[in-house]
């Protein structure tokens, strides 16, 4: 269909008006018509100016069609190549059938991709650099990924340089690794692809030992040519997540291979790590762990303690044995690996409730740090902080425990601490890092990978007690740099009535006064409303785990405490209620902790 329009222009000559006419023509199917004409030239065998020489035959064609469709041919014709001047090119790595199929597509813009020809099209589109056809093949194969063909497609996409297909197939292989590592196709996997699989946190295996078995099986399949790769691949196995007995067995049973490849000492070092620091490695693959929400509270009298845990997978609660945790008023609790760390607090007779605690005339803050090991139900002191502190916050990032804010030992009117410290559980050392930009009270900290967000108030006590949320800091743990963000919340928040939680590396806050959830966009520094939950008590606990936010307990009034637990599914913006806590609680410690399955102290068939 042709579309045209007239544009009339008027001008005058010697006072006499004359009209100039212009006609603009646009043919919507002009390109298709040219393609049809070129195809007719091909059918009539006329105007050919180039030849593709195959082993079986010579195929004539038109340069303009080749250059328009293939980056390979366009580059050939643009530079001073021998083929350009000779008027022909010899192709030996494609069949005549494949080249003819390419030409059919080039001249018509149409083809049919099937299970039988997709690999042929994939190969030729990769070699001839036909991006549209390559993407079509990639999309076709992505829809066909299965346990039967995934390892073959992974190799295929790696060979032909299809990043999209490789990414989708690698994801599938990683999530079905436990079913694939004994297959014959796995044994043929190339070194680079295997390395990418082993590096992933998402590698789906029931225990880390399976990863070590897979590496050794792959090496032994072609020992002479592959044993050189063992020193590199074995570092991708998280050996410190294996038990000491398992590692000792491998030293005994694989002694010759390990020594001949200089890997024996790597296993020995891993055994030393397990002996000295078992449970202090937070890099366990999610599929090898069991995840829990840990709850602990000591009553105001300092004697009655309640400790229980919630199994994420089974939606079940379990009351834990008496742990005798020393959680002083104003202390902070954080999980790290399979351990729980308690820092600081007041040694005096300060009240535990935050409203009363802040008003104490003197804070006898301590620098002590304690570690609780649930696997052994042991509680012990570790290295003390550099500065005594209470009413602070703590958070884990980059395999270090950071303590932020709070007040040190002294009278009630002393200012908030600017000092920030980090603790390395492996070296057992505290280090001072860059201080806060300014003082902050009621700090809430959340870590999103290497970024720590801290929210709170610039005042300690307001007329109505609830100070406004007006401090928002960002700390880059990699560069040791603080920055102050503009708190564009869009509405008023109380610093003591919000809970900050990370979900999939995104910061969320839950407002316990309005029952609303907001997510933070670091690029725009804007908070976005994500929905509302049914209700929540003041002083509730909040936890982010996987793609969910759990809100637990709290109080609606001094004599109205709840045991309710609500879950927000961020992926679908929905709330649901799950099993209630064994006891109604308010103002309690709440942390996520995970255990390697073979070390899980809270596992029970009847959990």
UniProtKB/Swiss-Prot annotation:
Record bears the keyword Repeat: yes
UniProt Kelch repeat ranges: 291-337, 339-390, 400-450, 452-502, 548-595
Alphabetized CDD domains for the sequence: BACK_KBTBD3, BTB_POZ_KBTBD3_BKLHD3
Positions of the BACK domain: 150-250
Pfam families documented for this protein: BACK (PF07707), BTB (PF00651), Kelch_1 (PF01344)
InterPro entries given in the database record: BACK, BTB-kelch_protein, BTB/POZ_dom, BTB/POZ_KBTBD3, KBTBD3_BACK, Kelch-typ_b-propeller, Kelch_1, SKP1/BTB/POZ_sf
Keyword Methyltransferase listed: no
Transmembrane region(s): none
Keywords: Kelch repeat, Repeat
Highest taxon in the source lineage: Eukaryota
Annotated BTB domain residues: 48-115
Gene3D superfamilies named in the record: 1.25.40.420, Kelch-type beta propeller, Potassium Channel Kv1.1, Chain A
PANTHER family xrefs: KELCH PROTEIN, KELCH REPEAT AND BTB DOMAIN-CONTAINING PROTEIN 3
Official protein name in the record: Kelch repeat and BTB domain-containing protein 3
Encoding gene, per UniProt annotation: Kbtbd3
């Amino acid at each position: 269909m042709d579309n045209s329009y007239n544009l009339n222009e008027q001008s005058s000559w010697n006072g006499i008006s004359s009209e100039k006419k212009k006609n603009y023509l646009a043919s919507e199917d002009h390109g298709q018509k040219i393609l049809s004409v070129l195809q007719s030239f091909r059918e009539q065998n006329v105007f050919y100016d180039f030849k593709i020489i195959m082993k079986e035959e010579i195929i004539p064609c038109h340069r303009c069609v080749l250059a328009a469709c293939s980056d390979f041919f366009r580059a050939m014709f643009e530079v001073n190549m021998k083929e350009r001047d000779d008027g022909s090119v010899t192709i030996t790595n494609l069949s005549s059938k494949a080249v003819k199929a390419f030409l059919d597509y080039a001249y018509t813009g149409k083809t049919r991709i099937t299970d039988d020809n997709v690999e042929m099209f994939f190969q030729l589109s990769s070699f001839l650099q036909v991006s549209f056809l390559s993407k079509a093949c990639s999309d076709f194969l992505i829809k066909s990924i299965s346990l039967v063909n995934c390892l073959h497609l992974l190799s295929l996409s790696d060979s032909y340089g299809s990043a999209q297909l490789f990414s989708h197939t690698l994801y599938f292989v990683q999530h079905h690794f436990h079913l694939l590592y004994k297959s014959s196709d796995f044994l043929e996997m190339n070194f680079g692809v295997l390395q990418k699989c082993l590096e992933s946190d998402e590698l789906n295996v029931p225990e880390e030992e399976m990863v070590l078995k897979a590496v050794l099986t792959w090496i032994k399949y072609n020992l002479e040519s592959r044993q050189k790769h063992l020193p590199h691949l074995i570092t991708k196995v998280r050996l410190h997540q294996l038990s000491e007995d398992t590692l000792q067995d491998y030293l005994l049973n694989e002694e010759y291979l390990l020594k001949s490849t200089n890997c024996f000492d790597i296993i020995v070092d891993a055994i030393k790590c397990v002996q000295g620091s078992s449970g202090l490695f937070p890099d366990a693959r999610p599929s090898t762990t069991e995840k829990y929400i840990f709850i602990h509270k000591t009553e105001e009298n300092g004697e009655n303690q309640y400790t229980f845990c919630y199994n994420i997978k089974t939606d079940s609660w379990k009351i834990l044995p008496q742990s005798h945790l020393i959680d002083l008023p104003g202390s902070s609790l954080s999980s790290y690996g399979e351990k729980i760390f308690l820092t600081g607090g007041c040694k005096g007779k300060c009240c535990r409730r935050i409203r009363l605690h802040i008003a104490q005339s003197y804070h006898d803050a301590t620098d002590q740090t304690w570690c609780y090991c649930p696997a052994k139900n042991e509680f012990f002191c570790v290295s003390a902080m550099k500065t005594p502190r209470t009413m602070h916050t703590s958070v884990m990032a980059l395999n270090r425990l950071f303590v932020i804010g709070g007040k040190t030992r002294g009278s009630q009117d002393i200012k908030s601490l600017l000092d920030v410290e980090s603790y390395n559980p492996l070296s057992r050392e505290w280090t001072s890092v860059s201080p806060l930009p300014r003082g902050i009270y009621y700090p809430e900290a959340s870590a999103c990978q290497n970024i720590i967000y801290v929210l709170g108030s610039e005042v300690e006590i307001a007329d109505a007690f609830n100070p406004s949320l007006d401090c928002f800091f960002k700390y880059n743990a990699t560069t040791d740099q603080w920055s102050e963000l503009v708190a564009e919340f869009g509405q008023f928040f109380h610093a003591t009535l919000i809970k900050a939680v990370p979900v999939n590396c995104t910061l969320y806050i839950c407002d316990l006064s309005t029952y609303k959830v907001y997510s933070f966009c670091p690029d725009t520094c804007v908070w976005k409303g994500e929905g509302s939950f049914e209700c929540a008590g003041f002083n509730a606990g909040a936890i982010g785990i996987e793609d969910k936010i759990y809100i637990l307990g709290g109080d609606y009034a001094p004599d109205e405490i709840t045991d309710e637990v609500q879950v927000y599914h961020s992926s679908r913006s929905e709330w649901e209620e799950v099993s209630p806590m064994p006891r109604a609680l308010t103002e309690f410690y709440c942390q996520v902790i995970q255990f390697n399955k073979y070390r899980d102290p809270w596992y029970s068939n009847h959990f």
